Amino acid sequence: MAAVTGWDRVEVKKRLSEEHWDPWMAWMNAYFPLSSSDRKDWDSKTWVRNLHELRLRDLLLFTLGDLRGKKVLDVGCGGGIYLGIVSKMGAAHIAGQDLSQKDIALARNRFQREGVPADIKLGNATELQFETESFDVVFSADFFEHVTLEQKRKIVSEVYRVLKPGGLFAIKTPNLSYLKFTTALRRVAAAAKLKSPLNIHVPHTRDNPDSEHCGLTTHAELEKLLFDRMFHDPEVIYPPLRWKGAAGFAARFLKGRKRFAEQIILTTRKPLFYGFYPGHD
């Protein structure tokens, strides 16, 4: 597609929000057609942050492996942006479940418009509306931070149920340990500038009426949930840190330590021997 020049920022945003089913799709379709000179006019921090998030999303999808011929479920699928990529990765069957009627409608309309068969269900993830042992791969991205610990237990049990023995389960969610660490650094920096550190807190956890991130978790808590449900020991993937300067130099030595991973990205598998045993539940 040729680069777009001489654009009006407000008009582009309005047009894209009307044409595209998901704000992230609108953002990507706004970014990539623009000329390099136009991109420079936009807030560089916003672009760096958003492109970094796309890299993290890629990293999760890379962990799913070869999806050709496989049945894949997205738990907490939202508008289906991940499933759209999964379908392009060759999955034989894609499915998703979410509690938001608006997001489910967006996903269904999108896949219908693109002619992609998709089994999209409306419902709570604590009760997945799919047959036992029906999926090769299940993943959940940017969802676990929105549910309580007790809900996570039920969701993990349901994922275990719908996965085939040996099936893969992948999770991506913000790392509470990292958020606490960086919040502490921001408070110290604020105090050094004679500003109140009390106004700085972990995002989406304070003064937020909908408690958007009520379920932020750590590697240890999440790994224990999986272990308690007899999943295999998780494989942890450490995403790259986007710090610059002295912090970026230090990040080279911090990579591989769970506390300093911005996101929790891990995979685990339903066991084979125990999974095939008829009395495992």
Residue ranges of each PLM-predicted region?
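S-adenosyl-L-methionine-dependent methyltransferase catalytic module, highlighting the catalytic core
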Residues: 6-7, 15-35, 148-162, 168-281
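Secondary-structure boundary/capping positions in well-ordered alpha/beta enzyme cores
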Residues: 67, 93, 114, 150, ...
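Short catalytic micro-motifs in class I SAM-dependent methyltransferases
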Residues: 142-146
